[in-house]
Amino acid sequence: MGALTKAEMAERLYEELGLNKREAKELVELFFEEIRHALEENEQVKLSGFGNFDLRDKRQRPGRNPKTGEEIPITARRVVTFRPGQKLKARVEAYAGTKP
């Protein structure tokens, strides 16, 4: 099973909507750029029927070097999280186990 890429998304827009390939590629890039920009501005991204992208601050915490066992601090950082919406969860769960 492969992964859906931005190029494949653009190809599907080209095929399904009749956009030319350049327009389809620009549309996909613009969509993701808007998500990136909103997150950079510390905004939550809510895609109805799909899910939410949020920013979460993680505190500094103790870690360990796996090779030496030495304790080292893991620095505080901000991470992007995704929570799938109920409709997406239901669709994925409906298809679970139907494909080899």
Curated annotation (Swiss-Prot):
Molecular function (Gene Ontology), one example: transcription cis-regulatory region binding
Gene Ontology biological process terms from the UniProt entry: DNA recombination; regulation of translation
Pfam family, one: Bac_DNA_binding
Disordered, as annotated region: 53-72
Cysteine-cysteine disulfides: none
Domain of life of the organism encoding this protein: Bacteria
Cellular component, GO annotation: cytosol; protein-DNA complex
Keywords associated with the record: DNA recombination, DNA-binding, Transcription, Transcription regulation, Translation regulation
The keyword DNA-binding appears for this protein: yes
UniProt key word Secreted: no
InterPro entries in the cross-refs: Hist_DNA-bd (IPR000119), Histone-like_DNA-bd_CS (IPR020816), IHF-like_DNA-bd_dom_sf (IPR010992), IHF_alpha (IPR005684)
Cited PROSITE patterns: HISTONE_LIKE
Family that this chain belongs to: Belongs to the bacterial histone-like protein family.
Job of this protein: This protein is one of the two subunits of integration host factor, a specific DNA-binding protein that functions in genetic recombination as well as in transcriptional and translational control.
Subunit organization: Heterodimer of an alpha and a beta chain.
Protein name: Integration host factor subunit alpha
Native source organism of the sequence: Pseudomonas putida (strain ATCC 47054 / DSM 6125 / CFBP 8728 / NCIMB 11950 / KT2440)
Source taxonomy: Bacteria, Pseudomonadati, Pseudomonadota, Gammaproteobacteria, Pseudomonadales
